[in-house]
Amino acid sequence: MTAEKSKALAAALAQIEKQFGKGSIMRMGDGEATENIQVVSTGSLGLDIALGVGGLPRGRVVEIYGPESSGKTTLTLQVIAELQKIGGTAAFIDAEHALDVQYAAKLGVNVPELLISQPDTGEQALEITDALVRSGSIDMIVIDSVAALVPKAEIEGEMGDSLPGLQARLMSQALRKLTGTIKRTNCLVIFINQIRMKIGVMFGNPETTTGGNALKFYSSVRLDIRRIGSIKKNDEVIGNETRVKVVKNKVSPPFREAIFDILYGEGISRQGEIIDLGVQAKIVDKAGAWYSYNGEKIGQGKDNAREFLRENPEIAREIENRIRESLGVVAMPDGAGQDEAEAMDEEE
């Protein structure tokens, strides 16, 4: 760059900073522009690895969608529990009016510290979200769900009234307002969404999500969660085998997958993931039905091995750290939090 151009650029930058404030424009090599992305663990080791950065990125919009009873709300409650372990504050906008507080507590959520709102309209839900984000004091907000964000005009109208595109316009306007503030306040905002079928689609995927296309564009991460099987114990179904696919990721390569178990009344089985990922990484040995670690047997069958790790959290943590090391994923700063969760399991 010539001296004349450099001088003109410096003058332009000075004018922009004077008009819009310091930090409104900067070089990528300066200060916070190159800082590592701050993340919140999902509570699933496999999903943290699939996301590429160790969790869900803060200061971004995340969409989690899937069929009914696929584990969407369970996953977000696990993220809230992980955030609370490191001292964060979370809010849950329950537009569906269906949050089970007792279930949230079982997943490790500190319910007395969780902010909960059950708004009457979509506008009210998004205004509350905007106010919380602008306060700068909230670390994470969950909106459950986009499909339940009913516009005021629809609520006040008659059953059967045709109001095309109303919800999509509401979401588009809200996200235009929210995105910049979310980035500045470093708040993680998760939208839970449902799946609908497009009528008349002959080729391609007929599935789509509610609320228009705005959320697809504004989301930095989109997770597709599906139940792919049942977990049985003595012919009794005790949980679901779940697959999460990272269909969009602006902070790491997308299209990675994670498979984990969700146990009824417990949430994501951390110990089950450690066993599965340990076997894949050849850290845990499997011979027939027996699992062993460092030459010592830890259980016959996955259930017994899971129980062993639950009773020996220090061994579980050691295996987890070795898995992270082998995959090049830095150990999470909230590592101590898992030991607390294991201690809670032992008390139960």
Swiss-Prot record:
Highest taxon, organism lineage: Bacteria
A GO CC term assigned to this protein in UniProt: cytosol
Amino acids binding ATP: 66-73
The entry's keywords: ATP-binding, Cytoplasm, DNA damage, DNA recombination, DNA repair, DNA-binding, Nucleotide-binding, SOS response
Family annotation (InterPro entries): AAA+_ATPase (IPR003593), DNA_recomb/repair_RecA (IPR013765), DNA_recomb/repair_RecA_CS (IPR020584), P-loop_NTPase (IPR027417), RecA-like_C (IPR049261), RecA-like_N (IPR049428), RecA_ATP-bd (IPR020588), RecA_C_sf (IPR023400)
Keyword field contains Lipid metabolism: no
Annotated GO MF terms: ATP binding; ATP hydrolysis activity; ATP-dependent DNA damage sensor activity; damaged DNA binding; single-stranded DNA binding
PROSITE patterns linked: RECA_1, RECA_2, RECA_3
Cellular compartment(s): Cytoplasm
Nucleotide-binding in keyword set: yes
Pfam families: RecA, RecA_C
Protein family per UniProt: Belongs to the RecA family.
Function recorded in the entry: Can catalyze the hydrolysis of ATP in the presence of single-stranded DNA, the ATP-dependent uptake of single-stranded DNA by duplex DNA, and the ATP-dependent hybridization of homologous single-stranded DNAs. It interacts with LexA causing its activation and leading to its autocatalytic cleavage.
Protein name per Swiss-Prot or TrEMBL: Protein RecA
